[in-house]
């Protein structure tokens, strides 16, 4: 057990040394060979520690039923072979005249440092504390002249460039998990785009087909028109796909581009159209060809496309003395009436009777009779609708 603790301690200390070299706060020059040696030592220490832990019968470390728990190896997004490269393998794969690339360049943990043909592998590498915005490149003249002086190479700041890998280096293939994640992101973006287009088309239809949805403006017959959509106060969140509809405010008006509404933040424009062409597919409401009779209903037997709103009917009420205490006794007038129903009144012991004109078949005139609450000897007669015929001598009711 003491050997296990000692191996663990040495592995952690070697890892701390590598981290200390990488996170140099003073920005000093760190030789690449020293960094490679420290990294290899740390990997070797942890490898020996793993071997000791996995050996259940070695040196009596594990006794009885105690076992080391092994966690299943998760799928890695990056290729694990990049982290196992060593200087010997890289030197064997590269040509003799080409300097061996540093493992840091293979790991791609930091920006790539371009090395020219004249530079040596012993040249120190500056490890930044954070990712720099620019890449450090050695001055080209220092490598071309082939000077053998021991002075450090001159470093200049240049714009970031993309350094291509060597010609013989195979491109690492992405694992299936990473490809599946990219496909999911692309499908989700397409779904969001389709939802936004669907919402915009629905709002366009509602604004065009509504009674008060759109108003036409502009004098020119061939002027271009636009639908103004205001995105000023929209604060979309990713909580649901319908948040875009709740936060989007639409102005249901069609305005000319040369008018006062051209300063809107977002506009959907249509092409040049004539005055006879409907604006943006504006469909006029179809009206039935049949004429309306006095009842307010269409005379056609087919499906009616008229508005179903109830017309405002003018009512007039008069007070007349009651003939008797019977509910059916109502005063006669110049028209004949037929009772078709009655309804109790809240707060009154007497019901309200409903009558329709029976002088001519199909007359839309109606009236209802009820007793006055304050004076039961008086009747309140309310007329509704107009007669569509001349006066006929009424029979006594």
Swiss-Prot record:
Listed GO MF terms: DNA-binding transcription factor activity; sequence-specific DNA binding
Classification via Gene3D superfamilies: WRKY domain
Tissues expressed in: More abundant in apices and young leaf primordia than in fully expanded leaf tissues.
Keyword Transcription: yes
Family matches, as Pfam families: Plant_zn_clust (PF10533), WRKY (PF03106)
GO cellular component, one term: nucleus
Subcellular location: Nucleus
DNA-binding region listed in the record: 326-392
Assembly and interaction partners: Interacts with RS2.
Sequence similarity: Belongs to the WRKY group II-d family.
Protein name, as recorded: Protein WRKY1
